[in-house]
C-alpha cells in the first residue's frame, strides 16, 4: 500500500495532476497515515491532501466513525475469524478424507472469510479516518452481488482496481488499440493483481484465469 501510494503521488506530480507538496509534514502524514497502512485503502494525494489541509472533527463525525469501526471489528472478529476457524479445522485433514459436499461447504466459508476479513479491516480504516477527520475511500460495494466478472471487480477492492486502471491499464493503451492489445493489457493487469495478492504460483494462475 505504501509503495503504491508513492508511485501514484510521483506519477500524478509528473503528469501535472497535482502540485508537489512542499510541506514535508503533510506529505509524511499522507504516506504513513496509520489506519490505511495494513489493508488500505490506497489513497491518492489529490483527495487526501485536501483532507489534510482542511481537516476538521465534529462530535457527529467522530460518532459516525466509531460506529463504522465497531461494525468492521465485528465483521472481522465475529464472522471472518469464526469462518476461518472452521476452514482451518477441515483443511487440517488429509484431502482424500474431505468429501465433495464438505469441500463445497469449506469453499463457500473461505470465500466469506476473505470478504469479511478484508472488508472488515477496510471498515475499521474508514471509521478511524472519520474519527480523526479524514474521509477515506470506500473499498467494497457488496461485490458478491455482482452479476458479471467486470462488475465484481468494480465492487471488490475498489482502490486497488482503480490504481491498476489509472497507472497500468490506461498507460498501456487501455482499450483504444484494438481487441488483441486490449486483451494483452487486461492479462498484464490481472497478472500483476495476482502477484500483488501473493508471489505463489496459485496467485499467478488466479490472475491469468481472470485475465
Where are these regions (language model features)?
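Membrane-embedded transmembrane alpha-helical bundles that form the catalytic cores
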Residues: 1-211
Amino acid at each position: 500500500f505504501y509503495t503504491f501510494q508513492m508511485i501514484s503521488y510521483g506519477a500524478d506530480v509528473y503528469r501535472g495532476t497535482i502540485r508537489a507538496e512542499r510541506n514535508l509534514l503533510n506529505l509524511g502524514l499522507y504516506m504513513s497515515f496509520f489506519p490505511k497502512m495494513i489493508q488500505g485503502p490506497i489513497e491518492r494525494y489529490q483527495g487526501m491532501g485536501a483532507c489534510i489541509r482542511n481537516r476538521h472533527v465534529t462530535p457527529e463525525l467522530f460518532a459516525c466513525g466509531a460506529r463504522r469501526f465497531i461494525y468492521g471489528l465485528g465483521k472481522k472478529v465475529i464472522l471472518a475469524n469464526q469462518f476461518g476457524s472452521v476452514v482451518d479445522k477441515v483443511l487440517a485433514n488429509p484431502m482424500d478424507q474431505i468429501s465433495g459436499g464438505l469441500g463445497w461447504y469449506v469453499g463457500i466459508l473461505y470465500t466469506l472469510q476473505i470478504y469479511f476479513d478484508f472488508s472488515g479491516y477496510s471498515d475499521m480504516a474508514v471509521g478511524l479516518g472519520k474519527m480523526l477527520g479524514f474521509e477515506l475511500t470506500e473499498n467494497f460495494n457488496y461485490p458478491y452481488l455482482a452479476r458479471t466478472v467486470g462488475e465484481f471487480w468494480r465492487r471488490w477492492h475498489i482502490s486497488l482496481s482503480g490504481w491498476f486502471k489509472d497507472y497500468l491499464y490506461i498507460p498501456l493503451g487501455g482499450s483504444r488499440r484494438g481487441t488483441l492489445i486490449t486483451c494483452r493489457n487486461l492479462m498484464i493487469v490481472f497478472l500483476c493483481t495476482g502477484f500483488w495478492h501473493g508471489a505463489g504460483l496459485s496467485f499467478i494462475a488466479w490472475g491469468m484465469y481472470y485475465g
